[in-house]
Amino acid sequence: MTAIFKREFRSFFHGMLGYVLTAFLVASSGLYFLARCLIYGLTDFSYYTLYQTIFMLLLYIPVLAMRSLAEERHSRTDQLLLTSPVSVWGIVLGKFFAMAAVFALPCAVDAVMIFILWALGGTVSALLANLAGLFCYFLLGCAAIALCEFLSGLTENQIIAAVAGFSALLLAYLMPSLRSMFNAGSAVALAVFTGIAGAASLAAGLRTRSFVLGCLTFAALCLGLTGLFLLRSAWLTEAFSAVLSALCLFTPFEDFVNNSFSIPAVVYYLTVTAVFLFFTAQDMEKRRWN
């Protein structure tokens, strides 16, 4: 894993990509830091800088992660990785930690800005609140990196990987607004869960190469959903609402912006990161044996 990490991290700075991405995020934070915090004397860095520039991650993260696995598949070097002594988890984690380290560079500059505010007369409580906000911002970025790394492994085209990552993050960014549009009741919930059941059944059928198993899985899931819709429709609606809430990737960060250290937000981001790293490892494991 260490060799993969070093190789990936160095590759970002052999060309211009690492420098451009770091400069892009630092410039975004720097402009808001200057315009809001220094000129107006506002000490809430988490809100006036990080929260105001969080949409920049929609561009930064997909471009950062687009080449992680897609380039390997395009150049066919993924076959060398999959047949090397390094485990699948070593490959996935090595690439993930390399991208997280690149993302940590602009975050380190943000930390310097926070200490500048403190040196100019900020309180210790404001310093701790801003550092907590930066910590959650980093966890948010790591969760987005894990998601985009997974999407990068599904294609060998870097542009498609970047567009898919941007689309997924944009959907998560807009989900708090979109969630109110889907509160139409249990019928909508049934339709959405049926679609999810179909996708899960298709994945099960493809993974096992069994059409019969896929059909039986879909039939069983549909039967269960129909029974739940007829007998306990409120449960279906509540579950649907919980699913939509789980898709709001950027919402937990607001707890830190409001100067409240939220353990559930930390657990949420760590869980999202672990889930998508697991999906990536499973996809690579499948290709290794195929």
Region roles according to the model:
Residues 3-11, 87-90, 254-255:
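Cytosolic juxtamembrane amphipathic/interface segments immediately preceding
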Residues 4, 142-149, 195-201:
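Hydrophobic, membrane-inserted alpha-helices
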Residues 13, 85, 123, 154-155, ...:
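Helix-loop interface residues and adjacent transmembrane-helix termini in multi-pass membrane transporters
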Residues 29-36, 40-56, 98-165, 173-184:
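Secretory targeting signals
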Residues 158-256:
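Transmembrane helix segments
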Residues 1-71, 96, 112, 203-213, ...:
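Hydrophobic alpha-helical transmembrane segments
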